[in-house]
Amino acid sequence: MKIIGWNINGIRGKSMNLFNKDKTINNECEFSRMLELYNPEVVCFGETKCQEIHVENFEQLPFKYKSWNCSRARKGYSGVCILSNIEFTDLGSIPINDGDIEGRSRVVEFEECVLIYVYTPNSGGRGEYRIEWDTVMYNYLEELKEKNKMIILGGDMNVVNMEQDIHSRKVLYESKLPGTLLHERLNFRKYFDIGYIDIW
């Protein structure tokens, strides 16, 4: 199964240029070129920034199965989706206490694996929410192991795990920027303690 994840920063934006004026798929846009080049069975989008009322505009995207999670907290914010040509069972969102009102996760189950795609909240000004998110995600990943299937977690984790994940080693060790904080990195590394590995 070939899976591609893409943080698109707005699926409706002109920069995506998905559709022609007659609403057909633009075969010259980056999305179409990516499909032609890689031919993925599954595409995951992060930061779609669209609302539920816009989802029907994307029905003609060349994937048979689609799962969207749009922000209900505010317009033009967050959002993720999973598009697939392989049938899946939609498991909804991670069990965050607010019901994932910001549209930050989608979970689907294929015959051979479970795929989780996330847009993890940035901790800047929201440290407590980020800690809650990390705790819920850890517990959910632990729980999913009971399915005895491969578990794939993808998306924007908003954390710098290793030096190779950032442009400057100095930023990683001397910064107080969100994503570089020690507790965020340690929380992320807890996933490895329960059998997950970091790939990129």
Residue positions per predicted region:
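N-terminal, active-site-proximal structural segment of metallo-dependent hydrolase catalytic domains
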Residues: 1-60, 74-78
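Active-site beta-strand/loop signature of hydrolases that rely on acidic residues for catalysis
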Residues: 3-8, 34-53, 115, 141-165, ...
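Short catalytic/ligand-binding loop motif for oxyanion handling, primarily in non-cytosolic enzymes
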Residues: 12-14, 51-54, 75-76, 123-126, ...
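Soluble or luminal CAZymes and related metallo-dependent hydrolases
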Residues: 17-18, 23-30, 100, 129-137, ...
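Glycine-rich, phosphate-binding/catalytic loops in enzymes
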Residues: 20-23, 59-63, 132-133, 169-172
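Structured beta-strand-rich core segments of catalytic domains in phosphoester-bond hydrolases
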Residues: 48-123
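Surface-exposed cleft-lining segments at the edges of enzyme active sites
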Residues: 96, 119-134, 138, 172-176
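Metal-dependent phosphoesterases centered on the DNase I-like endonuclease/exonuclease/phosphatase
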Residues: 136-200
